[in-house]
């Protein structure tokens, strides 16, 4: 294999590998996954970011030292941040508040200014991320709103790079391509190129349940928008760049199916990809299994799963969202979000130092820990206990937890009635749930609300 020398990180964008999947049930079909997660910014949106910035420079819309503003669910922002850092542009990104923390940390590490806005409002609301970004661009002197949703350089990136790469990799023999739609650039660009070079190639839409796009494909109409957790695809409006009239079939994919499929992809094929990949792969597998003759089908690993480790690949988060079902016991243990017998509860021992406890609190983003001795709860320590006992003296961080913890602990047997749990929570306390004397876990008000919500969802 010839190893190439590159002179800029932007030279690494594109020419991503194509992997045939062998360990998933693809029916009579051959299913290929284009590994866009191998781009330097970690997603297919690197292609779009490079194309849009280059075209803006060519048209004189961006001058050295200029400011770029964009609305993004994350990956376009990462691509823009990567290129903006190389070209010394200031970048301001408006992002929905459902974006993973890893993406936000990555964006800020690249030097971007990240402004969070609501993800529970629709287009036309002043807090909607696209409306917010457009307004911000109007108010910022010399700023260029790159506007991926209406920027022709977006689909151009796929018509000039992604499409011919696929065609070459599969020697011109592609029966179907499964895509998702966020801005619509991938679908629009691929369709434009394949219509000319491979008219037989069908386009399949993978759409998160709650998005309106699958309805538009199936019926030409759409109703009210729902909500979904998958990031980067699905919309509450029809993106101008999306050529939905050319879509052959649309599949609606729930968050549960998408997340489990992405996790399965990692477990059986070794590919760490993000939540939108789970949506695309779920639809691709359904399409493949529905065929009566062999076909060559392509879909995408849209981005890297390393941005979803705290969410989709975190069992505790998945349970809290109701995406991993835990068998109900019919007692108070059903309200425990982080169970001790599953290794999910962060605990302390009486002889641990306050410094060690504080480190655990910061590491796991929690404010209190149960203190265990021989499997029994002997106290609870929280941030206020640390404040009262340290009192600005760093030396006191070496004190043992036993000197700072609260020994007044409300312990409920798991067989107690829910009314007793509610009585404890009504007093602003945390309930300790036990099986006889064996500690099972803590229950907070938030845990109760989460359990109730998940019961409704199921």
Q: Where do the model's predicted regions map?
A:
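PLP-dependent amino-acid enzyme catalytic core
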Residues: 1-335
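Short glycine/proline-centered loop/turn elements that form peptide/ligand docking sites
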Residues: 98-101, 344-345, 354
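Bateman (tandem CBS) regulatory domains
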Residues: 246, 330-345, 352, 397-409
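The conserved cystathionine-beta-synthase
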Residues: 346-365, 372-373, 390, 410-429, ...
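Glycine-rich acetyl-CoA-binding "A-motif" of GNAT/NAT acetyltransferases
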Residues: 377-380, 418, 439-442
């Amino acid at each position: 294999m010839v190893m190439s020398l590159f002179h800029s990180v932007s030279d690494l964008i594109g020419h991503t590998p194509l992997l045939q999947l062998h360990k998933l049930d693809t029916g009579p079909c051959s299913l290929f996954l284009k590994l866009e997660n191998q781009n330097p910014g970690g997603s297919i949106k690197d292609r779009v970011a490079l194309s849009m910035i280059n075209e803006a420079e060519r048209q004189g819309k961006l001058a050295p030292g200029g400011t770029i503003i964009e609305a993004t669910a994350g990956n376009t922002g990462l691509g823009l941040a990567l290129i903006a850092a190389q070209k010394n542009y200031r970048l301001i990104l408006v992002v929905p508040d459902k974006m993973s923390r890893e993406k936000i940390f990555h964006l800020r590490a690249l030097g971007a200014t990240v402004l969070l806005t609501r993800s529970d409002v629709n287009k036309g609301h002043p807090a909607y991320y696209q409306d917010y970004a457009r307004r911000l661009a109007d108010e910022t002197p010399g700023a260029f709103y790159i506007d991926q949703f209406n920027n022709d350089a977006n689909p151009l990136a796929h018509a000039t790079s992604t499409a011919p790469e696929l065609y070459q990799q599969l020697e011109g023999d592609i029966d179907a391509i499964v895509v998702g739609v966020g801005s619509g650039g991938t679908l629009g660009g691929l369709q434009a190129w394949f219509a000319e070079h491979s008219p037989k190639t069908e386009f399949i839409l993978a759409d998160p349940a709650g998005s309106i796009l699958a309805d538009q494909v199936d019926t030409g109409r759409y109703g009210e928008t729902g909500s979904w957790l998958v990031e980067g695809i699905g919309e509450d409006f029809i993106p101008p760049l999306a050529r939905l009239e050319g879509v052959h079939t649309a599949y609606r994919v729930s968050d549960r199916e998408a997340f489990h499929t992405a996790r399965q992809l990692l477990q059986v094929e070794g590919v760490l990809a993000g939540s939108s990949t789970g949506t695309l792969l779920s639809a691709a597998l359904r399409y493949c299994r529905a065929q009566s003759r062999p076909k060559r089908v392509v879909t995408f690993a849209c981005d890297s799963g390393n941005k979803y480790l705290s969410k989709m690949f975190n069992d505790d988060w998945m349970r809290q969202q109701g995406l991993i079902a835990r068998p109900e016991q019919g007692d108070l243990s059903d309200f425990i979000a982080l169970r001790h017998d599953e290794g999910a509860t962060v605990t302390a021992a009486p002889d641990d130092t306050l410094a060690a406890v504080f480190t655990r609190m910061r590491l796991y983003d929690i404010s209190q820990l149960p203190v265990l001795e021989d499997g029994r709860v002997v106290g609870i320590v929280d941030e206020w206990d640390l404040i009262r006992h340290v009192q600005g003296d760093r030396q006191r961080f070496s004190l043992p937890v036993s000197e700072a913890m609260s020994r007044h602990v409300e312990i409920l047997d798991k067989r107690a009635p829910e009314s007793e749990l509610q009585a404890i929570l009504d007093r602003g306390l945390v309930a300790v749930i036990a099986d006889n004397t064996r500690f099972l876990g803590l229950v907070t008000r938030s845990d109760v609300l989460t359990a109730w919500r998940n019961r409704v969802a199921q």
